[in-house]
Curated annotation (Swiss-Prot):
Class of this enzyme: ligase
Protein name as catalogued: Putative cysteine ligase BshC
Disulfide feature: none
Function description: Involved in bacillithiol (BSH) biosynthesis. May catalyze the last step of the pathway, the addition of cysteine to glucosamine malate (GlcN-Mal) to generate BSH.
NCBIfam families per the UniProt record, alphabetical: thiol_BshC
Highest taxon of the lineage: Bacteria
Native source organism of the sequence: Heliobacterium modesticaldum (strain ATCC 51547 / Ice1)
EC number(s) stated in the UniProt entry for this protein: 6.-.-.-
Length: 547
């Protein structure tokens, strides 16, 4: 297994950020990648002594042990729990990332975010001499079930979709308030039927079957799998719906503070959005005039809180609050409240001494608008570090690249042009030239006769022209048939090019489409261990991972 560095595949604002273009970097309080900036942030976090380190550490240590039990790892050492315990130390720091709770861990990039988080935490701990804990924030409060409900696998020469169903009575429920689907066993059997047989499969099969009943919902199913996969490397998983979390000192007052500062938050976001627009990019987040930055849990459903005159109302429900009523609820019952895409990172950084946040390209574009949002809450946005970006190139695909003198850079734009070149090189008949010459000769032979007939009789001249068109059409029909037979003879080449595209760029970057487990079952834990060796210095690039 080996890495090769190539140009970043991030585009738009995120692409400009990883390439350190000054006009985009200026939107962020810290430059990337700048170890001195990370060290400065670490010193600032250490000087801030109001984080609920001890209480949060206790909650997270207990949660890592629960995840170990769910995954069948009870009795073994639990490095994630050990790391959670280290968070209680007075000078501890955190590197944070997060993602939705995707089915069977979702797309590959979820794993790459977690791996980057572990790597960066290890690097910063070595530099600062302080405990630096890698934390993965599961987006259990998100209510977009469609986004997490399916994964894609490559089966032969086609992509298959594995889906879990939702319960009709759980519409708009947060993922963390949903129960496991009744037909999860059916989903698992479909998943298993498309996975390779290997020596690494049985332990995972046992885990997947065990998780049909233990977790409380899809969020814990996801968290338990991620814990088994990366807990041994110290990844600490945080669920914002964890019992007791919103009662922690900094968390309990957070929602009331958001309501009290909503005007400043809205103005800060507007400034950030306008800056992005002036640079020629499309903002990823904008808010309507009545929208706040919070949701409210009502009868299980996660509903947006909207301004309504001097008070508030819930979208999709006939429920209103006065300002004082909502502020009182936020103080007394913070569990009723949930952040949105703007305030989620603020809550995260109220709880954790975040030294850096590991972000995907979409998140980078979001954070570009948030600097003044943080300031509105008296906070500073952490350094934003791009996640590891990877394409896995298996041996048989690498051989095809070599055979046809293709590079990875050829693949995203499509290989049709290169395929035509290959087919043309195999065209010993010279089909194009042959039929162009034939058509030219037919026209040369016909046209003098057509012209003489037209001079003799216009009506017969029209008939002669139609006759020429029919002859040309027959020649072109013959050309199509000859080309079709040529393509049949070249089908192996077509299949090879199709295979390269399906494996490396199936209509989008591989990391955004496929799941980790087909690769993990083929290559075992060495796959993860090699990913954990990816150089942090390469985060501004794309990595080709040959295995």
């Amino acid at each position: 297994m080996s890495f090769e560095r190539t140009g970043s595949i991030f585009s738009g604002l995120a692409g400009a950020y990883v390439q350190r273009e000054a006009h985009v970097v200026s939107l962020f309080p810290y430059a990337f990648p700048d170890e001195n900036a990370l060290a400065l942030r670490a010193r600032r976090m250490t000087a801030t002594d109001s984080y609920p380190r001890s209480e949060l550490s206790s909650l997270l240590e207990g949660y890592q042990r629960r995840l170990a039990d769910l995954a069948g790892l009870e009795g073994s050492s639990n490095r994630a729990a050990d790391q959670a315990r280290r968070l209680a130390e007075a000078n501890s720091l955190a590197v944070v990332t997060g993602q939705q709770a995707g089915l069977f861990t979702g797309p590959l990039y979820t794993i790459y975010k977690a791996v980057t988080c572990i790597n960066l935490a290890k690097r910063l701990e070595a530099k600062t001499g302080q405990p630096v804990i890698p934390v993965f924030w599961v987006a259990s409060e998100d209510h977009d079930f469609e986004e997490i409900s399916h994964i894609k696998l490559l089966q032969g020469e086609k992509t298959v979709v594995i889906t879990m169903t939702s319960r009709p009575d759980e519409d708009r429920f947060a993922i963390g308030h949903r129960t496991l689907p009744e037909d999860l066993a059916v989903t698992l059997e479909s998943f298993l039927s498309h996975l390779p047989q290997s020596e690494h499969r049985l332990p995972w099969e046992e885990t997947w079957h065990r998780l049909l009943t233990g977790p409380t919902g899809p969020h814990e199913h996801f968290a338990a799998l991620l814990h088994k996969l990366l807990g041994p490397y110290g990844l600490v998983i945080l669920d914002p719906l964890l019992s007791g979390l919103k009662q922690l000192p900094r968390c309990a007052s957070f929602f009331a503070s958001v309501l009290e500062n909503e005007v400043s938050l809205r103005e800060g976001l507007s400034r950030g959005v306008e800056q992005i627009r002036r640079l020629g990019y499309t903002p990823q987040v904008e808010k309507g005039p009545e929208e706040t930055s919070l949701f409210y849990f009502h009868q299980g459903r996660r509903l947006a809180i909207l301004r309504d005159g001097r008070g508030y109302r819930l979208r999709g429900a006939e429920i209103t609050f006065s300002r004082d009523e909502l502020l009182d609820l936020a103080q007394r019952q913070p569990d009723l409240f949930s952040t949105n895409v703007v305030t989620r990172p603020l809550l995260q950084d109220q709880l954790l001494p975040t030294t850096a946040y590991v972000a995907g390209p979409g998140e980078i574009a979001y954070f570009a608008a948030y600097r003044d949002v943080y300031r509105a809450m008296g906070m500073e946005m952490p350094p934003i570090v791009p996640r590891l970006s990877v394409t896995i190139i298996e041996g048989f695909v690498d051989k095809l690249l070599e055979r046809y003198a293709l590079s990875f850079a050829d693949v995203p734009a499509g290989l049709e042009g290169r395929l035509r070149e290959e087919l043309a090189a195999q065209d010993e008949l010279g089909i194009g030239a042959l039929f162009e010459e034939l058509e030219s000769q037919v026209r040369a032979a016909y046209l003098p006769a057509v012209e003489r007939i037209a001079r003799w009789d216009r009506q017969m001249g029209n008939l002669a022209e139609e006759n020429l068109d029919r002859v040309i059409a027959q020649a072109r029909f013959l050309r199509q048939k000859v080309e079709h037979r040529h393509r049949q003879r070249c089908q192996d080449k077509r299949n090879h090019f199709r295979k390269v595209e399906l494996h490396l760029w199936p209509g989008a970057p591989q990391e955004r489409v496929y799941n980790i487990f087909p690769y993990l079952l083929k290559y075992g834990s060495s796959l993860i261990e090699t990913l954990l060796e990816a150089p942090v210095e390469w985060l501004d690039s794309h990595c080709l991972f040959r295995c």
